[in-house]
From Swiss-Prot:
GO terms for molecular function: exodeoxyribonuclease VII activity. HAMAP family: Exonuc_7_S (MF_00337). Its EC number is 3.1.11.6. This is Exodeoxyribonuclease 7 small subunit. One of its GO terms (biological process) is DNA catabolic process. It is found in: Cytoplasm. It comes from Clostridium kluyveri (strain ATCC 8527 / DSM 555 / NBRC 12016 / NCIMB 10680 / K1).
Length: 72
């Protein structure tokens, strides 16, 4: 079965839910630590997605600059 890749938006929603639950102060210390750990993992996924997008933009920008160079 193919693995479904998560979108930036879906990961961000999960992270927002974790933050909201931690803000409510209703979690035990153990659950707060688990939530924090999950939040860090989600942040790392978001950073990875953003870094990949940044690299794609750099490549596209560099290719675009080469394609549109006008010789004087």
């Amino acid at each position: 079965m193919p693995r479904k890749t998560e979108t930036y938006k879906s990961i961000m929603l999960k992270l927002e839910n974790i933050v909201a639950s931690m803000d409510s102060s209703e979690l035990s210390l153990e659950n707060s630590l688990k939530s924090y750990e999950e939040g860090v993992k989600l942040c790392n996924k978001l950073y990875k997605i953003l870094n990949e997008a940044e690299e794609k933009i750099k490549v596209l920008t560099e290719e675009g600059e080469r394609d549109f160079d006008i010789e004087s």
